[in-house]
Amino acid sequence: MVFLLCFFLVADVSYGINKDCLLPMDVGRCRARFPRYYYNSSSRRCEKFNYGGCGGNANNFHTLEECEKVCGVRSRDSPKEN
């Protein structure tokens, strides 16, 4: 019973969010420090991080506005700096 409750709570939070936004933050395998934004599904905000320049995943946006638009975040919920 508890499992089902947890499942539905998690499903409700992620329903309708672009699947790329649910990927974990990934700085990539290179060592550059490009400022980027990713959607943090725990805080439900777009947050800043430093991208290494290669590799990584699709949860990687050039601007806060792009992250918010793709991931459906309201501006008042962001930004959160890392």
Curated annotation (Swiss-Prot):
CDD domains: Kunitz_actitoxin-like (cd22633). InterPro entries: Kunitz_BPTI (IPR002223), Kunitz_BPTI_sf (IPR036880), Prtase_inh_Kunz-CS (IPR020901), TFPI/VKTCI-like (IPR050098). Residues 1-16 form the signal peptide. It comes from the Eukaryota. PROSITE patterns: BPTI_KUNITZ_1, BPTI_KUNITZ_2. One of its GO terms (molecular function) is potassium channel regulator activity. Residues 21-71 form the BPTI/Kunitz inhibitor domain. One of its GO terms (cellular component) is extracellular region. The record marks R31, A32 as: Reactive bond for trypsin. It is found in: Secreted; Nematocyst. Disulfide bonds join C21-C71, C30-C54, C46-C67. Gene3D superfamilies: Pancreatic trypsin inhibitor Kunitz domain (4.10.410.10). Keywords: Disulfide bond, Ion channel impairing toxin, Nematocyst, Potassium channel impairing toxin, Protease inhibitor, Secreted, Serine protease inhibitor, Signal, Toxin, Voltage-gated potassium channel impairing toxin. Residues 76-82 form a propeptide. Belongs to the venom Kunitz-type family. Sea anemone type 2 potassium channel toxin subfamily. Dual-function toxin that inhibits both the serine protease trypsin and voltage-gated potassium channels Kv1.2/KCNA2. PANTHER family: BPTI_KUNITZ INHIBITOR DOMAIN-CONTAINING PROTEIN, KUNITZ-TYPE PROTEASE INHIBITOR-RELATED. This is U-actitoxin-Avd3l.
